Amino acid sequence: MVTITDCYHKANWIGHPVKVRLIIYLFAGSAPLSVFTLSTISTVISIRQLYHNGCSGFITESGRT
């Protein structure tokens, strides 16, 4: 099972323009993407965009601000 923690670690070191394609490649290359996985990837991308934009919002365990 893919967790938000697994995805975020990978997203953290990937450069901003490349990270979306690389995260999707990491999962699409090894297994079919489930709805849960797509949702997880979307949440990771949202977190990274908030971080990149300097948002000081509080991020909960669910990944929502």
Swiss-Prot record:
It is a single-pass membrane protein. The keyword Cell inner membrane does not apply. The chain crosses the membrane at residues 22-44. It is found in: Host cytoplasmic vesicle membrane. Facilitates virus release from intestinal cells in vitro, possibly through the host autophagic pathway. Keywords: Host cytoplasmic vesicle, Host membrane, Membrane, Transmembrane. Its main location: host cell. One of its GO terms (cellular component) is host cell cytoplasmic vesicle membrane. This is ORF2p protein. Residues 13-18 are annotated as: Important for viral replication in intestinal cells. It comes from Poliovirus type 1 (strain Mahoney). The keyword Acetylation does not apply.
